[in-house]
Amino acid sequence: MLIWLVELADHFQFFNLFRYITFRTGAALFTSALIVFLFGPAIISSLRIRQGKGQPIRADGPQTHFKKAGTPTMGGLMILAGIVGSALLWADLSSIYVVSTLLVTLGFGAIGFYDDYLKVTKQSDKGFSGKARLGIEFVIAAIAVFFMMQAAQSAGSAGSTFGSSVTFPFFKDLMLNLGYFFVLFGGFVIVGAGNAVNLTDGLDGLAIVPVMIASAAFGLIAYLAGNAVFANYLQIHFVPGTGELAVILGAVIGAGLGFLWFNAPPAAIFMGDTGSLALGGLIGTVAVATKHEIVMVIIGGLFVIETLSVIIQVFWFKRTGRRVFLMAPIHHHFEKKGWTESQVVIRFWIIAVILAMVGLSTLKLR
């Protein structure tokens, strides 16, 4: 919204700053962090009163988790307030990429909120029907992908199929045109990302820091892919308008820092599905917009590992009646092996940093 102040730059040189994505990204980070810091205590207090017993703890989980009973959930509301409030101030709301990303973020956040609500009111770890939840998520994601695909298509040359194509790291000219099936592919990527972060969110601070790391990596990718000069230099695909997504990702980092202040062990609040689904969906949407869906598998590799551990566990148990891991997702497996919660969290953070660096290295390896 404040980008409109650029029109005053002819009269006041200061307002020229609002033209620069880098300035607005930094401002968005600061603003979202401030929003969470200021309103976080009141939100936590309100949720604690309204929820009573707080988030239910899995009966088959590690014994150390039972001391967390009574901790309120739905902390994603704080994160969403920071992201959306900051985005409304600093992002270009005329950008279809910004609007699509906010649509997915708020849509997935609403689904997560309802899921959290059911879990708290029923005092059960069984919330929203899995199939219904995935179906609604996919519809929201598909709508966003369709509009982003059309935007990328119209920005290309006449007859271009770029908007509906999947690109590959290491190979600049290799593209696979999926046509309208790209909507299905992009929807799968976004829904997968949302639920992968959701599965990772099982320990204090475990999900939010890798989310911030992935956001920083994709903020850089969005800025570079949206800049013709940098995109040409790095030989990555130029996607006009996606640079604006760096502002949104700056807001994610700021909101994440604010949330981590309250989520640091012992957590005063949990993110809940409200936050994890929204944040994962946001990252997935940016990956689709910037044409870096495959690179997201590397940058968000920690989330992929967590998801695969659940898939393997369920598949193998149904097939043989035995478990591959002591408990899934895999972070609980290591807790059962004797790792302390802080050991699991910090070591997984390290893995997230390494994977983000590997993912970013693909930008130059062509």
Swiss-Prot record:
InterPro entries: Glycosyl_transferase_4, PNAcMuramoyl-5peptid_Trfase, PNAcMuramoyl-5peptid_Trfase_CS. It holds the Pfam family Glycos_transf_4. Keywords: Cell cycle, Cell division, Cell inner membrane, Cell membrane, Cell shape, Cell wall biogenesis/degradation, Magnesium, Membrane, Metal-binding, Peptidoglycan synthesis, Transferase, Transmembrane, Transmembrane helix. It catalyses: UDP-N-acetyl-alpha-D-muramoyl-L-alanyl-gamma-D-glutamyl-meso-2,6-diaminopimeloyl-D-alanyl-D-alanine + di-trans,octa-cis-undecaprenyl phosphate = di-trans,octa-cis-undecaprenyl diphospho-N-acetyl-alpha-D-muramoyl-L-alanyl-D-glutamyl-meso-2,6-diaminopimeloyl-D-alanyl-D-alanine + UMP. Its EC number is 2.7.8.13. It is an enzyme of class 2 (transferase). Pathway: Cell wall biogenesis; peptidoglycan biosynthesis. GO terms for biological process: cell division; cell wall organization; peptidoglycan biosynthetic process; regulation of cell shape. Its cofactor is Mg(2+). It is found in: Cell inner membrane. Its main location: membrane. It is a multi-pass membrane protein. The keyword Secreted does not apply. The chain crosses the membrane at residues 27-47, 71-91, 93-113, 134-154, 174-194, 205-225, 245-265, 268-288, 297-317, 343-363. Signal peptide: none annotated. Catalyzes the initial step of the lipid cycle reactions in the biosynthesis of the cell wall peptidoglycan: transfers peptidoglycan precursor phospho-MurNAc-pentapeptide from UDP-MurNAc-pentapeptide onto the lipid carrier undecaprenyl phosphate, yielding undecaprenyl-pyrophosphoryl-MurNAc-pentapeptide, known as lipid I. This is Phospho-N-acetylmuramoyl-pentapeptide-transferase. It comes from Sinorhizobium fredii (strain NBRC 101917 / NGR234). The lineage of its organism: Bacteria, Pseudomonadati, Pseudomonadota, Alphaproteobacteria, Hyphomicrobiales. The gene is mraY.
